[in-house]
Amino acid sequence: MTQTINEAKHILSEINSIEVLEQHELNQDVRKGIQQAITRRRKQLLKEQEILDHYNTMNKFESELLNNNPQALICGIDEVGRGPLAGPVVACAVILNEGHRYLGLDDSKKVTASKRQILNKKLKDGVLEYAYGLASPEEIDELNIYNATQVAMNRALSQLVNRPDHLLIDAMSLDTTIPQTSIIKGDAKSVSIAAASIMAKEYRDDLMKEIADEYPGYEFEKNVGYGTKAHLDGLNKLGITPYHRKSFEPIKSMT
């Protein structure tokens, strides 16, 4: 018996590989609606495969470490907030769960806000462990942003209950006895670092919204401390807050 268009769409929705789709008897159905549904499903499957392939590529560092030690606890570490004029720098340390597959993970700057929020919830619910570390604006001014970032990363690492066997760090090195690999643009090359990037970003964004409630007029809830026009206008009208980095221009020239 010939399926209705809706019945055919349901059948197609349950096909999970291009190979099965191409061999399915529905390809012989010449009805326009059926052929359009097949084309749509083919595009969906190709996109899903592209996302999976990207995830597997980003899992390369983790896979190599696990090949050497299947029980290894691998910790990804990244930070957000080096460039803003206000607010702390925030680091996150993440140990992903065994058999993880958080499809869509990437550098937090490449992921939309809505997808970041979804991924952040999945990560918080699913990973083996995560922890945050902060360095304050005062510490940034005293130590410089690079050294303050190291402080934030070390604080995140120290909050973990489980001691990692290996660290994957985005373009930094830490003073620790734990073996580590520093990866340039690691948040786009390692799923563990990408997870840390997204979780740190969401944590810091929420923190800047709280600061915006305390100090309205700078639009911290939108610019998260970066030097937008609204932020600079706020500085000129309202002055410097305790959350501003006094070693960063134009604040440095205002003190």
Swiss-Prot record:
**Catalytic activity field:** Endonucleolytic cleavage to 5'-phosphomonoester
Cofactor binding summary note: Manganese or magnesium. Binds 1 divalent metal ion per monomer in the absence of substrate. May bind a second metal ion after substrate binding.
Residue sites binding a divalent metal cation per the record: 78-79, 170
* Role according to the record: Endonuclease that specifically degrades the RNA of RNA-DNA hybrids.
The cofactors named for this UniProt entry are:
Mn(2+); Mg(2+)
In terms of InterPro entries, this protein maps to: RNase_HII, RNase_HII/HIII, RNase_HII/HIII_dom, RNaseH-like_sf, RNaseH_sf
Q: State the name under which the record lists this protein.
A: Ribonuclease HII
Q: Which GO terms describe its cellular component?
A: cytoplasm; ribonuclease H2 complex
Q: Which Pfam families match?
A: RNase_HII
Q: Please report the stretch or stretches of sequence annotated as the RNase H type-2 domain.
A: 72-255
Q: What class of enzyme is it?
A: hydrolase
Q: Name one GO molecular function term.
A: RNA-DNA hybrid ribonuclease activity
Q: Could you tell me the superkingdom of the organism this chain comes from?
A: Bacteria
Q: Primary place of residence?
A: cytoplasm
Classification lineage: Bacteria, Bacillati, Bacillota, Bacilli, Bacillales
Keyword Cytoplasm carried by entry: yes
Q: Give the species this sequence originates from.
A: Staphylococcus haemolyticus (strain JCSC1435)
Q: Which GO terms describe its biological process?
A: DNA replication, removal of RNA primer; mismatch repair
Keywords (alphabetical) are: Cytoplasm, Endonuclease, Hydrolase, Manganese, Metal-binding, Nuclease
**Location relative to the cell:** Cytoplasm
Q: Which family does it belong to?
A: Belongs to the RNase HII family.
| EC numbers on record | 3.1.26.4
